[in-house]
Swiss-Prot record:
Gene: ispG
Catalytic activity: (2E)-4-hydroxy-3-methylbut-2-enyl diphosphate + oxidized [flavodoxin] + H2O + 2 H(+) = 2-C-methyl-D-erythritol 2,4-cyclic diphosphate + reduced [flavodoxin]
Described function: Converts 2C-methyl-D-erythritol 2,4-cyclodiphosphate (ME-2,4cPP) into 1-hydroxy-2-methyl-2-(E)-butenyl 4-diphosphate.
A single GO molecular function term of this UniProt record: iron ion binding
EC main group: oxidoreductase
A biological-process GO annotation: terpenoid biosynthetic process
Protein name: 4-hydroxy-3-methylbut-2-en-1-yl diphosphate synthase (flavodoxin)
EC number(s) given by UniProt: 1.17.7.3
Naturally occurring in which organism (per UniProt): Aliivibrio fischeri (strain ATCC 700601 / ES114)
Amino acid sequence: MHIESPIKRRQSTRIYVGNVPIGDGAPIAVQSMTNTRTTDVDATVAQIKSLEKVGADIVRVSVPTMDAAEAFKVIKQQVSVPLVADIHFDYRIALQVAEYGVDCLRINPGNIGNEQRIRSVVDCARDKNIPIRIGVNGGSLEKDIQAKYKEPTAEALLESAMRHVDILDRLNFDQFKVSVKASDVFLAVDSYRLLAKQIAQPLHLGITEAGGARAGSVKSAVGLGMLLSEGIGDTLRISLAADPVEEIKVGFDILKSLRIRSRGINFIACPTCSRQEFDVIATVNELEQRLEDLITPMDVSLIGCVVNGPGEAEVSHMGIAGSNRKSAFYEDGVRQKERFDNDNIVDQLEAKIRAKAATLSKENQIDINQID
């Protein structure tokens, strides 16, 4: 029912984004980014709350102007999830949002001005205990690095990242995490592998500009799956041209599939064939929607016939093995006397799952921030 992940995670230092621990064995944090106009406070707050509802640990907000910084102040007062301010070029914006309680600054020290300006931001972050995320992207490398390498390479992304890391090192600031994102899976993976050998700080994973919901999810799962399976990564974002809520769902699904961090129901369902005795596809789709609010980790198997049904059910918290008119029901791997009417499986199983989740939650005192 619960198989421990065989993955041994890379040892890293620990930082905190608000109250969320990052690195040094902490649960891998799942985050997203708002796509509203930050100056539209109501829309931005609503989106942040929708992200928090589906489990977002951290939310990033773009703050491109001083007007956006003023809006950020109001937004921060209305939400509880830790917020990262995404800032480029203007160091004054970083100083301003620091005064407004930002939980993390996403800046690249090398692009916010001269040494004095960089030092002022870093000193402010140190004084207020605000971590920094260095964010390198294959599509926006420094001009001299572009000229040197001609095209984005793993070595180019690493050089860019280390340039910013060296700045923070010179200023004796070690409360930071780093990302080296690229839209190409192999480029991103190779870049993170190189970086993981160079620094001890936490790594923020992502395949940038991955695409739409379907293709982007697949690309992210492949790239991040490779890295996570090697123990690389302390926090992640799935970058989709889609509703940011989907980014959180996909992020947790990737972690769940690797048994790294589980949230909610893990459905094991057959692709169906002519042997199915109940409508598996409709059942899975309906239950996924109805049970989105559950955070308790559970394995639920929905198999349409008795070929694989009993075997899957025996290693699940709950399971259905399809049979004629009434299907067999399993709980904790044991077949129950009760059988489910094939025409009413969804309602019956939802009630059973909710009751089981409540029991497990009470027994284990489930705190989603500690599920790892």
